[in-house]
């Protein structure tokens, strides 16, 4: 199995994704939100690029819609929820459709439409994601959503942890140089949050007093669900 990493949503080459399995990672916080919402019984998540698109879906849909998302880590005016996974509890999301728009994560998802299979991963479900990848048994591209088009340490080290989870299942992994680097960084910094504390995006969230979000997002494998993006929305994968 060949594994490569794309360092941000802006670095996605759509042609490279054709017939590939793609994993989207944005641990702070979009993929943590999506995984949490699906785990708590959300019917589906619709990732969109713009605030206007999200509001149009909510206006025209007959479904029970929750609007969620952020711009520059802050809740969007008129939306129900921000991009905090702690808000997407079973009480609020069970049986409902979440329309989500974020700065980085939903852009990475929508830019990956050419892929054969698109799975959503974070630290909170990495082992479950690794099991699904093993079942698919196909070459893999891990897409880090990044931060405003730039490399993000938090997504990168999460990629390294995901690779480590795969190594615990199978040994026939052929890593690109960047994938080897991510795995090396993780294996030498297994206390991920301590390593990431100096990262730009981490510091931004901490400055907004979102320490509880950070604490939640840096937990490993508390959820055994893998969301899958297909035909414009995200549901629980049956892989």
UniProtKB/Swiss-Prot annotation:
It comes from the Bacteria. Its cofactor is Mg(2+). Pfam families: 2-ph_phosp. Its EC number is 3.1.3.71. GO terms for molecular function: 2-phosphosulfolactate phosphatase activity; magnesium ion binding; sulfopyruvate decarboxylase activity. It catalyses: (2R)-O-phospho-3-sulfolactate + H2O = (2R)-3-sulfolactate + phosphate. Keywords: Hydrolase, Magnesium. Belongs to the ComB family. This is Probable 2-phosphosulfolactate phosphatase.
